[in-house]
């Protein structure tokens, strides 16, 4: 739930309090690693877990862990509980890791993300916020507890919305501001794939989707981000030249 407010409409939010970054509530939604280990140990004790607890944790952690909702709770990263239960629902009966590590039910609504990308495009900034995030895996900003809809395109509000959508999490501090980062491989894959689809749907330029898909997969799973942006740059240059020739610019 995002804290977008309508200042010109009485919404009732003036009697509420935003607990999103209160360290006392960091662990209220999700599983701590101790809780995940206890759960796996139980299934191991009743002979339902095919692998060792540490082995299964090693598989789950990069995909489902690393959510933090307060700068004072960096020592207490949380697992997404829905993702953990999705994994166990497949792993326990089949005795193997699911082929698809991502539950479709947790995917951010595509239309929401497409709207965010359009907002990002309209900002007119020298460097796209989303491009900065997918390039570096992190960004700095201030998490806003509330902001009106008409101010959504302001950088800190935009980054805050990505945080409230679960696409960014608190990683620490940098330059006196909050360091926000992509939490795990699930969100990384989700963000990359939706970016590609949104750019394609917006008809910003046409791409060889098979080739781009391979580059994006390499970026998501192996961290090879440079070839993706080199491909974008070459296609932008090529297609801009064609458009200028056609339009006589």
Which functions belong to the PLM regions below?
Residues 1-249:
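Phosphate-binding site recognition
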């Amino acid at each position: 739930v995002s804290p977008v407010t309508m200042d010109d409409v009485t919404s009732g939010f003036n009697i509420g309090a935003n607990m999103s970054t209160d360290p006392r509530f960091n662990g209220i939604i999700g599983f701590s690693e101790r809780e995940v280990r206890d759960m796996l140990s139980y299934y191991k004790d009743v002979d339902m877990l095919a692998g060792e607890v540490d082995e299964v944790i090693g598989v789950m952690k990069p995909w489902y862990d690393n959510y933090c909702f307060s700068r004072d709770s960096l020592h207490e990263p949380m697992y997404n509980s829905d993702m953990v239960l999705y994994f166990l629902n497949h792993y326990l009966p089949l005795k193997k890791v699911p082929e698809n590590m991502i539950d479709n039910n947790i995917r951010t609504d595509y239309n929401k993300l497409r709207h965010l990308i359009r907002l990002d495009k309209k900002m007119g900034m020298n460097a796209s916020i989303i491009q900065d995030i997918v390039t570096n895996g992190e960004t700095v900003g201030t998490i806003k507890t509330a902001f009106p809809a008409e101010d959504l395109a302001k950088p800190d509000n935009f980054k805050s919305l990505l945080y409230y959508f679960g696409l960014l999490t608190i990683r620490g501090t940098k330059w006196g501001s909050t360091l926000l980062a992509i939490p795990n491989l699930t969100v990384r894959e989700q963000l990359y794939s939706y970016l590609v689809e949104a750019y394609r749907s917006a008809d910003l330029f046409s791409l060889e989707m098979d080739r781009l898909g391979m580059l994006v997969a390499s970026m998501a799973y192996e961290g090879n981000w440079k070839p993706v942006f080199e491909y974008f740059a070459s296609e932008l240059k090529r297609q801009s030249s064609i458009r200028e020739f056609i339009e006589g610019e």
